């Protein structure tokens, strides 16, 4: 079995309890120092993590920061006072690590900014989110201060101002991190920062793991190299406690929340105690038997279950890699949660809109396969179903086809129907047909006269006023109306004249029938069904000439021609010669003539040759 990496110098064997005892036995002067604000590292400008002091000047820095400074800096000098450095010493240990040992162990290689595209996108995306949150907090503060009861809301204003300060602090850390990326800082130094690692637990980033970290570390191997793993875990856990988001967070409003506080902020100075618990748990059980419930108890239940699971995954990846903390940070790869693909999947990274803060719920369970389907915001906009996510078959963003429903695309226009037959000859209209009974049976039970120029929509008209108006009438075709003389079946536009002495039926007393009906379909749809012969030659041309001659509007020509036809029929001096098979037109009643004239005007057969 391969031995663990020796990039970190062997430390003197010391138990984790020694760290706790050294902190418990403090002088009064050290207690006063606890009350003072914690110093910041002059290299990273953040709170010192894994405090390490220099040999001669005793200035303190982060362990990772001073190691990177001594290896890639101008020389073994203090970053603050330029005093030569012969060795460094971690707080809580007696081991002195010389500069020669640090250089022999290897330094994190500087990385070009173009090689950290993903890391830069991760940080830049979080910076934009911080700026949006600050603007939102400013709007809420302004709205709360302008209210009349602002004194009662003073605690809320103080809470909002505190959240704004925390957001500004996080924004400054992220901007410095992005500046380091632009200036070619090593990937290990970027990924090991608490400002970057907290993005992993805020559901912004997903770890793609290491290809050589699949074999779990056994308890025997862990105990044989306990000094190495003690130093590795201490460096890792010191950073992670400042990265894990606390379970309870203040809310900006009723809809939005933000990770303001970490486990370090709410642990009340119990970081070393938590580190001791986790180290003892790994020493007793190994990495295979780590239980989320027990790890949560070791973290004092201050983080959510989701964060605990992500923390265990990172912890196992580090230990199973058998690398130091910096080496592991330089080797592991991360991607934005909304991206699909990656080098580990054999694909190019497919990026989507960075404004999406969280991954959609339907994609969160699909992490078993390394070949992720492409997901874009257009799938939801255009109504695509997400069932394909469970079948493993990506679906196009747009659903095209005859049965597709697209809210952004109008329905196709209906195909226009063919032109109907021109009309019915006069001889057929005035001749009794043997098929009148069958035509009558095909007709509707009620026949409605429709006038397009009537303005009395939905208004009830008295019977006396209806005779002088154009209100549609409804006639019944029931067997009780035995005096029927003329029947118009307008559903298929077929007119049938009967030579029996029957009068028109009375209008049906029906409130719904008294209301005017509108054409639901174009008139050509009715003309297609009419069983007619060709009109006399030139009749339609004469009607067109009349329309052009008097410059009739096309929308009102039908009504004007109906009135003209009615007046022309009344003024007829000589009646038309009647036959034995057709009734005398001169004997028609005015209502019968109006019915006939209405039909003629609709079919275009209006003009009568003298």
From Swiss-Prot:
Region (Disordered): 1-36, 390-411, 431-515
Ranges of Acidic residues composition bias in the record: 448-470, 478-487
Keywords linked to the UniProt accession: Metal-binding, Zinc, Zinc-finger
Biased composition (Polar residues): 1-28
Database matches in InterPro entries: RNF141-like, Znf_C3HC4_RING-type, Znf_RING, Znf_RING/FYVE/PHD, Znf_RING_CS
SUPFAM superfamilies linked to this entry: RING/U-box
Domain of life where this protein originates: Eukaryota
One Pfam family cited in the UniProt record for this chain: zf-C3HC4
GO molecular function: zinc ion binding
Residues forming coiled coils: none
Listed Low complexity bias regions: 432-447
Zinc finger (RING-type): 41-82
Keyword Cell wall biogenesis/degradation applies: no
Name the record gives this protein: Uncharacterized RING finger protein C32D5.10
